[in-house]
């Protein structure tokens, strides 16, 4: 320990002569410049950064090694700093964890503030009630707590993969998807990069100060400096972290902006795709219309070709009938056969084209199915929107319930205020009546709302009936579809029957061939020819029957087509009905919203009424408090004046046996003083009273001396002055008549000023006559003033009655409150009598006070009874409101269930429509297959008919030729041999089932053989 240098006085002294750069950097060299008692002046201007710039190397070494590399005696300081930094890191982690809780607390602050405001308002009301009446304890009405469920909004956090999926769901093109995925990956990689590291370090820091007085300073200064330095390091670290967080925030905002841009692009692309799809739909519909026109044209062409074929067949028959032109007709038949083959090929080519067109139509149908699926998705979106609207309606209902609760609370407040109204005045009793009327109006409005809800329920029931009718129609349509299936099965059976008929035809042809063989064997007999003709006729008849059967089948097909079209129309009508029902439901929703708006308007009107009531009550309370204070002050002043008069009069009794009483019973009465003639009456009366007469004076002998005359003149002057002052008082009384509310105030002021005048007179005079005159005059005047005050009280009562009549016009009467008002009026009359008797006798005044206390107790008991009755009424009203609310909620739940059932029914109808459409497509495909089979059968039938006709004509010609040549020929055997040869050449005798179904090429070869023959 060194000695203190003589230069150091212990006070702050400057040490700027040593530069900062020449000072040592380590604490080991601190002995060269010992500590002083105070910090050096020059270090105050230096920043912390300059002080700690020399310790960066040590800080980096400590951070890299994790241990103290500086070998000195301050290891415990470094350990303390390290522990502080670790504690700061833990505090930062806790702060991050607490930030989440702060976010949750912010949501609760608004609720707490609203609750605080409500508590403040309730406290103010309670204080006001305590000031109004501290004696009466108002019973607390229990608050009815409804079933409230707090809305808990859980914080939904989406991961990056979910956001990526949602963004990619908007994209449909593969190229855009790949670009978007690359951008998303880059952004996610940038998100996943580690944040910038903030290097922290701990070190023992030596503040660069001069140390001169080492013996005086202690080690605590070093410790404080170390702590301050560490705190500054932590502050720098926090600043760096704040900058990093700001950068991250800006990056996230930029990314959000990019996300929003991409989302907008996706929405634009989606809108474009929708527009393109709508255009394609329109073009496909136009193409369908064109294809239908083309199909009709092709059908007309086919009909024309059929007619042409029939004409050709007729011409062929004519040509075949001509015997002379048989060969020529055969050549034409060949040409026509070739032409028919060409037409057949062309027809097959057209059929192939039609098949291709049908394939295209099927592809378009597939596209329409896809569009239908998209429409179904849109329907699901609409359903979701409907559910969202229902949720909004539920929220609105919750708001309405909250408003009802507020209305109930307002009613409770109104009831509490009505208690004070019943105790104090009739005005507030009538305001209670207003509240009852408002409650009745609310009940009526609720009844009207219930009637509207019932009407809406009836409408919903009508809609349900319509839906049931639609279901019945759908069932009928299903039955018709089943009938169509049965008819299709019948058609298939008929096709089988037609095939069987064809087989029978083939059998008939075989029989004909057999008969021909028999004719070949029995050609010698002429009767066999007739049998052959009969059998041929029978076969023709069978062919005719088959043709009729085919025509019947064609008619059945046409009828089926018509029925299918009818079913399609019925389906369209059902869809229109569904759209109409949806529109009706939307209208009902709008009506419900309108009803909710009406309910809100009624709530607002009720709130306005309550505000007006509150204002009226406040005004009445202020008026009543002022009137009471004024009345009590006036009565107290009057009591003091009366007692002072009594004492003064008792003191002024100089004569024995002559006692002047202080009561007003011995005074003469005066009635009906008019306020208009008060001044003139006062002047004349005072002059009469001033004249001395032996009748009026109390003194038996007249004044004889000059002193008495002087006294009398002096008294006369004083009396004149008193008259003038009384006139001034009356003028003041008239001027303040409208300003003052309480009529008792004027009499008190008059008495007070008169007492002052009397004191002034009595102090300067000793005349008893003058006092007696003044006393008599004052008694008369006091009576007149009392009567004037009574008239003013009557005027005030009239004004109050006018106000009551105005309020009664607005509000209805209540029996209980009217009884209370009558009791209050009786109490007021008793109080008036008490006031008049108070001026007469002091004993009666005390007795009246006791009576008034008893009356007040009775009134308080009555008020408690009334409060109980009102409380019961309020509880009943609350119970009814709860019941109506529950009924309303139950009705809303029923409506929700009904809408859910409607949605289910709509979905079921859509499914049934889809099923019917599928059946329809399947039926169409079956009908198309059936028509193709029928056409093939018709072609085979036509071919067989033509071949049979040709053979029949050839046989008839041969028979005719045989008949003609029968007489000419000499040898019948030769003719029969020729007939058999011709039959063999034609190939009739050796026909089989395979030859019946031969193509036209073989037929042409057979026709050529006939022509060669």
UniProtKB/Swiss-Prot annotation:
Keywords: Cell cycle, Coiled coil, Cytoplasm, Cytoskeleton. The keyword Cell cycle applies. Residues 19-40 have a biased composition (Polar residues). Its main location: cytoplasm. It comes from the Eukaryota. Residues 1-46, 457-485 are annotated as: Disordered. GO terms for cellular component: centriole; cytoplasm. Signal peptide: none annotated. The keyword Cytoplasm applies. Residues 235-525, 564-626, 867-926 form a coiled coil. Residues 466-485 have a biased composition (Basic and acidic residues). Interacts (via C-terminus) with spd-2. Plays a role in centriole duplication in meiosis and mitosis. Required for daughter centrioles to acquire duplication competence and become mother centrioles, and for mother centrioles to maintain duplication competence. Regulates spd-2 centriolar localization and affects the recruitment and incorporation of downstream core components. Also required for the assembly of a peripheral centriole structure called the paddlewheel, for centriole elongation and for pericentriolar material assembly. Required to maintain pcmd-1 at the centrosome in early embryos. This is Spindle assembly abnormal protein 7.
């Amino acid at each position: 320990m060194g000695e203190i240098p003589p230069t150091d006085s212990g006070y702050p002294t400057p040490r700027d002569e040593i530069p900062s750069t020449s000072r040592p950097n380590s604490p080991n060299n601190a002995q060269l410049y010992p500590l002083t008692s105070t910090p050096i002046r020059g270090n105050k201007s230096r920043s912390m950064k300059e002080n700690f710039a020399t310790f960066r190397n040590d800080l980096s070494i400590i951070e890299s090694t994790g241990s103290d590399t500086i070998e000195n005696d301050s290891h415990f300081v470094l350990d303390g700093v390290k522990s502080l930094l670790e504690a700061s890191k833990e505090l930062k982690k806790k702060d991050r964890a607490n930030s989440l809780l702060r976010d949750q607390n912010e949501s609760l602050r608004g609720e707490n503030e609203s609750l605080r405001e409500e508590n403040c308002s309730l406290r103010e009301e309670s204080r006001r009630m305590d000031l109004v009446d501290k004696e009466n304890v108002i019973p607390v009405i229990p608050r009815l707590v409804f079933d409230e469920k707090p809305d808990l909004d859980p914080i939904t956090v989406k991961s990056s993969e979910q956001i990526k999926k949602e963004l990619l769901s908007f994209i449909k093109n593969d190229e855009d998807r790949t670009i978007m995925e690359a951008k998303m990956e880059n952004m996610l990689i940038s998100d996943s990069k580690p944040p910038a590291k903030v290097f922290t370090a701990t070190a023992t820091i030596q503040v660069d100060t001069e140390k001169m007085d080492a013996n005086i300073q202690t080690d605590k200064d070093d410790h404080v400096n170390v702590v301050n330095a560490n705190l500054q390091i932590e502050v720098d670290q926090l600043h760096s972290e704040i900058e990093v967080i700001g950068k991250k925030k800006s990056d996230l905002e930029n990314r959000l902006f990019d996300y929003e841009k991409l989302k907008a692009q996706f929405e634009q692309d989606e809108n474009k795709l929708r527009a393109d799809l709508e255009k394609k739909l329109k073009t496909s519909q136009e193409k369908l219309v064109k294809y239908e026109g083309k199909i009709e044209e092709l059908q007309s062409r086919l009909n024309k070709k059929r007619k042409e074929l029939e004409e050709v067949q007729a011409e062929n028959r004519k040509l075949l009938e001509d015997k002379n032109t048989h060969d020529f007709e055969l050549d034409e038949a060949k040409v026509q056969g070739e032409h028919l083959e060409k037409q057949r090929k062309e027809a097959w080519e057209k059929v192939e084209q039609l098949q291709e067109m049908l394939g295209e139509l099927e592809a378009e149908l597939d596209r329409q199915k896809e569009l239908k699926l998209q429409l179904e998705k849109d329907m699901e979106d609409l359903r979701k929107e409907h559910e969202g609207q229902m949720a909004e309606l539920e929220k609105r209902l919750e708001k309405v319930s909250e408003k009802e609760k507020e209305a109930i609370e307002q009613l409770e407040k109104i009831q509490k205020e009505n208690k004070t109204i019943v105790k104090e005045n009739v005005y507030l009793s009538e305001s209670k009546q207003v509240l009852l009327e408002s409650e009745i109006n609310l009940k009526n409005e609720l009844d009207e709302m219930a009637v509207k809800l019932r009407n809406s329920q009836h409408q919903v029931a009508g809609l349900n009936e319509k839906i049931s009718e639609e279901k019945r129609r759908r069932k009928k349509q299903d039955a018709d579809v089943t009938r169509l299936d049965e008819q299709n099965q019948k058609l298939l059976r008929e096709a089988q029957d037609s095939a069987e008929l064809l087989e029978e035809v083939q059998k008939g042809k075989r029989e004909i061939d057999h008969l021909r063989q028999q004719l070949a064997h029995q050609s010698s007999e002429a009767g066999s020819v007739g049998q052959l003709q009969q059998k041929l006729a029978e076969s023709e008849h069978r062919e005719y029957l088959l043709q009729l059967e085919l025509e019947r089948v064609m008619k059945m097909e046409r009828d089926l087509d018509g029925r299918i079209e009818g079913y399609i129309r019925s389906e369209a009508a059902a869809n229109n009905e569904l759209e109409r029902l949806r529109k009706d439901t939307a209208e009902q929703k709008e009506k419900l919203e309108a009803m909710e708006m009406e309910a809100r308007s009624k709530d607002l009107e009720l709130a306005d009424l309550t505000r007006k009531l509150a204002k009226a009550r406040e005004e009445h309370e202020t008026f009543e408090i002022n009137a009471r204070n004024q009345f009590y002050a006036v009565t107290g002043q009057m009591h003091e004046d009366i007692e002072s008069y009594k004492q003064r009069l008792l003191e002024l009794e100089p004569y024995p046996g002559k006692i002047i009483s202080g009561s007003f019973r011995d005074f003469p009465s005066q009635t009906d003083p008019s306020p208009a003639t008060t001044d003139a009456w006062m002047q004349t009366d005072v002059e009469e009273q001033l004249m001395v007469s032996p009748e009026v004076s109390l003194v038996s002998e007249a004044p004889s001396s000059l002193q008495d005359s002087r006294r009398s003149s002096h008294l006369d002057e004083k009396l004149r002055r008193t008259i003038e002052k009384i006139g001034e008082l009356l003028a003041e009384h008239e001027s303040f008549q409208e300003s003052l509310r309480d009529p008792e105030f004027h009499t008190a002021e008059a008495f007070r000023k008169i007492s002052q005048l009397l004191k002034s007179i009595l102090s300067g005079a000793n005349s008893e006559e003058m006092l007696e005159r003044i006393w008599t005059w004052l008694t008369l005047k006091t009576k007149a003033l009392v009567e004037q005050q009574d008239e003013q009280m009557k005027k005030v009562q009239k004004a109050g009655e006018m106000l009551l009549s105005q309020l009664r016009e607005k509000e209805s009467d209540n029996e209980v409150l009217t009884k209370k008002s009558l009791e209050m009026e009786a109490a007021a009359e008793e109080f008036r009598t008490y006031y008049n008797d108070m001026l007469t006798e002091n004993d009666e005044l005390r007795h009246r006070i006791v009576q008034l206390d008893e009356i007040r107790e009775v009134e308080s008991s009555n008020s408690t009874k009334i409060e109980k009755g009102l409380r019961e009424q309020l509880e009943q009203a609350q119970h009814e409101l709860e019941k109506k609310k529950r009924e309303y909620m139950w009705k809303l739940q029923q409506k929700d269930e009904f809408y859910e059932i409607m949605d289910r029914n709509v979905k079921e109808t859509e499914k049934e429509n889809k099923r019917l459409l599928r059946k329809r497509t399947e039926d169409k495909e079956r009908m198309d297959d059936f028509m193709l089979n029928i056409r093939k059968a018709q072609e085979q039938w036509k071919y067989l008919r033509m071949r049979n006709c040709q053979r029949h004509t050839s046989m008839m010609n041969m028979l005719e030729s045989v008949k003609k040549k029968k007489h000419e020929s000499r040898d019948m055997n030769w003719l029969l041999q020729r007939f058999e040869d011709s039959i063999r050449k034609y190939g009739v005798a050796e026909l089989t089932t395979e030859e019946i179904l031969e193509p036209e090429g073989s037929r042409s070869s057979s026709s050529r053989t006939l022509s060669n023959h």
